């Protein structure tokens, strides 16, 4: 893992314990963000392509074009997101104006990973604008 990525991950994991307050966001925003991520993961578990696609931001929807292409990409590229064994929500943070929800996922291979979900407000709803996976510092279970 490149040194910069390690340093960024270490800073994120050690900065503030629990769910950090992000300027301009309420506790209900945090709950809504976690709800969107959780409902999208449940849609993936059911292979509900249209349902999962609905939680993606307009930019992601435009990039993939169809729910089926989106689901296929997640299935191939993000197996821990597509079929997690466990999901644990971490810190909600703000990075250069971006809202990022940290989620600890354990995939079917039992290897923990940290998913960094970039969130975007669309009207009065939250949508997922991107997801980056990094290795967790935890040992697989």
Regions found by a protein language model. Give the residues of each.
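A short, structure-level motif marking secondary-structure boundaries and short turns
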Residues: 24-26, 101-102
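Repeat-mediated protein-protein interaction surfaces in helical alpha-solenoids
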Residues: 20-22
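Exposed beta-sheet edge and beta->alpha loop/turn motif
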Residues: 91-141
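N-terminal export leaders
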Residues: 3-9
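N-terminal signal peptide c-region/cleavage motif recognized by signal peptidases
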Residues: 15-17
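Intrinsically disordered, low-complexity polar segments enriched in Ser/Thr/Pro and acidic
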Residues: 29-30, 141
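Gram-negative bacterial Sec-dependent N-terminal signal peptides
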Residues: 11-13
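Short solvent-exposed beta->alpha transition segments
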Residues: 24-25, 31-35, 39-42, 49-96
